[in-house]
C-alpha cells in the first residue's frame, strides 16, 4: 500500500490506495503455483494461466492481451505459468512496467522429484507428461532482481504449507 499526497495540500495524506501489481510465478509444473495463487491471491488479483487457454493457437499473445486488459482496468493480476527463462519473463516485466505496476516474482524452488510425485497424483488435463517437467527443469533459470522485479521471493513447499522468503 502507498500513501499519496493530494494536490494543493502539501503534507496532507490521501487514504491508503491499493498498488497495482503484476505477480509472475516461476517454477516447474506441479510445484504448487496454482495452489499458491488460490491461497494467497484469488481474492485480490486476477488470474492468467496458459493452462486455461488450451485451444488458442498463440497462447503467448492471448496471455499478453489478458494481462494487459487487467492492468488497463486497474486490476492486479497473477501470471500462473512456468515462466522458466529470462526471455519468457521479459515481456511480462516490461508490460507491468509500462502500466506502472509493481512487478513481483515468486520462484517455486522445488525438486523435480517432488513435482513428479505431485503430478502423478493429478487426474485428467491437470496431469502433464513427465517429459514436460524434465524439459522445463533443463530450461529453468531462477529469476533475479536484475530482470526488473521490484520484489522477488523464493517459495518452497513444506508439507501442506508454503515457505516464502525474500530473495
Describe the predicted segments one by one.
Residues 45-47, 103-105, 151-154:
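Conserved beta-strand scaffold positions in the cores of enzyme catalytic domains, especially
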Residues 2-26, 31, 42, 111-167:
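Conserved GTP-binding G-domain of TRAFAC-class P-loop NTPases and closely related GTPase folds
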Residues 85-118:
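Mid-chain, well-packed structural core segment of small domains
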Residues 60, 64, 86, 109, ...:
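Amphipathic alpha-helical transducer elements in NTP-driven molecular machines
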Residues 64-68, 96, 121-125:
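Short, hinge-like loop/turn segments at secondary-structure boundaries
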Residues 39-40, 91, 95-99, 139, ...:
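Alpha-helical structural signal in soluble globular domains
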Residues 26, 31-87:
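Conserved substrate/cofactor phosphate-moiety recognition/catalytic segment
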Amino acid at each position: 500500500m502507498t500513501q499519496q499526497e493530494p494536490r494543493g495540500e502539501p503534507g496532507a495524506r490521501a487514504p491508503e490506495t491499493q498498488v497495482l501489481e503484476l505477480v509472475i510465478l516461476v517454477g516447474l509444473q506441479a510445484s504448487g503455483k496454482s495452489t499458491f495463487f488460490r491461497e494467497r491471491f484469488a481474492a485480490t488479483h486476477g488470474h492468467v494461466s496458459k493452462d486455461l487457454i488450451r485451444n488458442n493457437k498463440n497462447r503467448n499473445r492471448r496471455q499478453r492481451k489478458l494481462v494487459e486488459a487487467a492492468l488497463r482496468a486497474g486490476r492486479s493480476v497473477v501470471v500462473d505459468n512456468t515462466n522458466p527463462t529470462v526471455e519468457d519473463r521479459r515481456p511480462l516485466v516490461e508490460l507491468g512496467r509500462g502500466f506502472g505496476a509493481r512487478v513481483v516474482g515468486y520462484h517455486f524452488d522445488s525438486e523435480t522429484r517432488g513435482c513428479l510425485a505431485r503430478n502423478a497424483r493429478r487426474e485428467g488435463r491437470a496431469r502433464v507428461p513427465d517429459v514436460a517437467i524434465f524439459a522445463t527443469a533443463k530450461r529453468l533459470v531462477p529469476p533475479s532482481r536484475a530482470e526488473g522485479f521490484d520484489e522477488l521471493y523464493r517459495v518452497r513447499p513444506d508439507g501442506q504449507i508454503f515457505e516464502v522468503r525474500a530473495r
